[in-house]
Amino acid sequence: MEKDVVSLEDALEHGLTKEEFQKIQEILGRIPNSTELGIFSAMWSEHCSYKNSILKLKTLPTTSDKLLAKAGEENAGAMDIGDGLAVVFKIESHNHPTAVEPYQGAATGVGGIMRDIFTMGARPIVSLNSLRFGNPDEPKNKYLLSRAVKGIGDYGNSLGIAVSGGELFIDECFSKNPLVNAMTVGIVRHDQMASATTGGQIGNSVYIVGATTGRDGIHGASFASKDLSKESESKRSAVQVGDPFMEKLLMEASLEAIQKGLLVGIQDMGAAGISCATSEMSAKGKTGMKIDLDLVPFRETGMNAYEAMLSESQERMLVVPKKGKESELVSIFEKWNLNAVKIGEVTADGMIEIYMGGKLKAKIPAESLVLGGGAPRYERETKRPSYLDAVKTWKPDEIPDVTKGANSKEILLKILSSWNVCSRKPITEQYDSEVGLVKLIGPGLDGGLSAIPGTNKALATATDCNSRYTYLDPYKGAEFAVCEAARNVYVTGATPYGVTNNLNFANPYIPENYYIFSECIRGMGDACRFLGLPVTGGNVSFYNESPEGPIFPTPTIGMVGILENKEKLIFNFPKEIGVELAVLGNFRPSLGGSEYLKKIHGQINGSIPELDIKEELELCKLILSLNESRILKSAKDLSLGGIAVALSKTVLFSGLGIESDLTSLRRNRLDLTLFGESSTAVLVGFDSLSKEDIRKQTEAYGLKFYPIGKTNSSGILEIKDAEIKISFQELSGPYEKGLEAVFAL
């Protein structure tokens, strides 16, 4: 056993509290040494233990007869999709690393979430990303955004995994603290799913496989569990360095070993590295492990036990093979030119014992380290922020309606050029969306749709959150995020299936921040419960703030859906002339929190769009029912930018013209009609012969039918009541150029 002991000051420097340090001493029956303190600090960090969020997360709905893995019990969520197949999916953040080293920070975020998926035995088929950055007109923000996107593209493209969608949201609050949330979805046969456990197999060998271990990423978990500060720039050593080509080899070798039935368990070495993998696998299998660090393949000389246990070097796995299968395991990894080295064995006493240089460096009960075991759990003080009441006093009559007359056209073009509305092509062109030949509906639209190889099914995917909405109304904003993600799935024709979430918030020790977090959890939970969607897992990222202030609360929703027959997909936009257009649902536009209010009037204020969760469910049922009858030519979610932006995008993506009359949608202000944002509204296209049938079905679901126009061959958008008449070319200029300068070489 190491002779050194640590002090309370050491514990505080490691991010632990006085009470936590006392609890560690009670668990061990003594004062920990430096290696043990490092292990506890990483495993009890917010990033690994969810200590300030787990009690709230347990209120989310997590039950479904389709669930194959309980939330939080495996590396990712898994749901039965029929035919003996499961969809495996998860979203995770890499926010702080991206803030200090955007290329590697974003790239390794992609690599980490990929490993979570193929560690379950699933082959990743698509990925998505949800990004939040500050104004790209500022050089630092432009650098962060452009480098992060390149990191995401380079890593994902090298792995050969298609990008099916994602989102980008720009606001000044993300200038010093960008958000990078990466989601991956894979497919696996039920009988080939793997688990992160020792399986209770006492005496089995423990192998480290994949890349060598270096000093990169040490304290990565702790770094992600603190506020960003001026000193954060010096924490580049806490940012992991990725090698996507190594990851590709690791993926193929791991999947081969799983499919050949060689493994008892397998765990990605992500946050906290060997510390996390050994303790989580042991705790789940109700065993311990004895590990000899001298056997670990190192890439750097002179590494000590503290560094080895906390290294977050990428592209590594911890594996427990079945007895008698060890040599076959090694052969597979050698074939892929990867390390597969025995470093220990499974023990019966429940202890993690770490040796180096022939000496015992750490001895800790596995259960004491893990989420749901001995890791601390807190519910923090809450206080409703005063601004939440202040913003609700704002009324639209405080701003002029600047859309009257010829101004409508000018305003529309400004909104089309805004960071949050303009074309994502400069981003999506850096991602390979064609690899794997699975794309049916690609990135840049409402939701992605991808063929599931070997079946007639398709997988719908979406990520959504309007951070302004959750800032203005945490509860309703989170509800809205769930409903919009569901809408973006079902407008492809797919049935929403399950949710993964990435909860990006500020310091939880500040009562106002914890109130916002709690309300977002409550809103998300209520929406998921009513829509019948289980939350299969996800990620919490606290401490997203800088000396300039906190980010807007961003509970990113990752949604998956299944289309049983991929021939029944619905496109976002019509492809023929003479297609009738109508809005289905309940059009209740609001200027509160809208892109129009921010872009044109420079304000973030007001009440967000009204949402009736019952109507949202009925609208989902309606769209899916109409699609079964094959009478829809197109379906598009109506939200950011309002009806004027939706019609503009229809012209831009279809190349057709539209003659529209918004009388059925008209409100007392023209700007509210054109640019007000609404929940529970979908813009659909259909043949004129189906018009009355669709109207009757819509009304039968208790919803409203708003006819607004028809497509033609002119390539011109005409909105009669707004005196708008704009050609494809006029629309295309500002829309396409919005992000071009950010990514110009």
Swiss-Prot record:
It is an enzyme of class 6 (ligase). It is found in: Cytoplasm. Substrate binds at residues 93-96, 115, 240, 312-314, 541. The active site is at residues 47, 94. Keywords: ATP-binding, Cytoplasm, Ligase, Magnesium, Metal-binding, Nucleotide-binding, Purine biosynthesis. SUPFAM superfamilies: PurM C-terminal domain-like, PurM N-terminal domain-like. Its EC number is 6.3.5.3. Belongs to the FGAMS family. This is Phosphoribosylformylglycinamidine synthase subunit PurL.
